[in-house]
Amino acid sequence: MSLESLTSNLWTRHGPSAEQLLSDRRTKIIATLGPSSRGPEKIKSLIEAGANVFRLNFSHGSHEEHLAVLKDVRKVSAEMGAWVAILQDLSGPKIRISNVEGDYCPILDGDPIELRFSQDKANLSNATTIFVETVNPMTTLKPGQRVFLADGILELTAEKVSSDHVACRVAKGGRIRSRVGIAFPDSDVDLPATTKKDFADLEWGITHGVDYVAISFVRSAEDIDQLRKVINEKGSAAGIIAKIERRAALDNIEEILTAADGLMVARGDLGLEVPLEQLPMLQRKLIEGANYCGVPVIVATQMMHSMITAVRPTRAEVSDIAAAVMSGADAVMLSDETAIGEHPQECVRYLSRVALAAEQTFEFQEYKLRLRDADTQTVPDAIAYAACAAAIKTKAEAIIACTETGNSARLVAKYRPHQPLYGLSRKETALRRMALYWGVRPIFFDSGENHDFEIESSLKVVQARLKIANGTRAVVTGGRSTKTPGSTSILEVRQMNYL
């Protein structure tokens, strides 16, 4: 590919318009809500900038705080006519330190520092003593072993283990914040994927209708099945996102992909489990595996870390985002950048611009070759594959997936069609779930009681909403029974002549 052809489809130095960002971008954006981004006006600005999914991090905040945020998201998105999903991220058994005096404090290279075990909230960490929750460092560490804080940004070395504390030395200093994660990479710490707190938080999430639940530190499909049982018993439609953070998850990735509704490449904790130089290769392999199975995959952690304080991303961050998009990621996620950062709206806007630019060079043909042997044994999957092929052969300008659960749209997205993809449903839960799927633009419509009405009304809705010219072809998928999940078995190529 020549430099001229590579740049011919990109924009001027001013970048794409806000309208382009929202209408053209296929990769979805997840923004974590926190102190920097709470409140109706800030949430509205993030949606306008391009956020599709909002993450509630249950490692921080109370149920009351999260409920206020959830209500704001639902109210604002309804007023804007935007289908936005809410992702509840369970904290899992992540080992954390206590709150810090003054919320943060510096520790310097070479300084002595003690680790102590405490579950008393009154004990505050400082520059000389760090209180560890969940795991007793005295029974976990041996002299010479490493201790990582804040995803490895800070590093300690254990020097002496006593009955009531572990004496350490700061190997890599920095600033510690309240309740940051702490890891023992040289120790074998075996903790369950889901804690009592997680089940209490999950109960809250189901009660208040979250769209996705992320389970941390997954080891196997059994962890997901355990969570699924609770969700199903409560009658919830929430999808489960498996966060890949442990070596055990890598060993069991095939069964995890079969059990989960989505995958998150959680590079922070995963980068503590494997050598950092292996992380890019693992990320690519995880994306390929999820793509092959048609499971949405999210790339997360430090996507734009510098923008917690800086007004623009680094060149390396921009390249990292582009690499994730061009590898086939369905979504990219912002964490501290939007939760506690100084420029949450700008972070989302930059991320949207970079993702959209990267998509202009996405190798659709190479991607389809990668998927040519993918599982198309089910009828809905075969229909999805055929819809993408038919759209190319007939020069259709849109693909419409009429769906009860959102699953049909997800399957079409698996094959990464060039054409705009619209997911039409009468169910709000399905419309919000589709907010995570690559390239899917959710639209509400009442499917009616029969197939013919469904096809006609879907074409009318899409043409009227998007002002598509008469005579334009569209590929439509649906089922004979319009309100039966999993019944997609029909594909039609139709002309839109309703304006």
Please tell me what each predicted stretch does.
Residues 1-499:
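Non-catalytic helical/linker scaffolds that mediate oligomerization, partner binding
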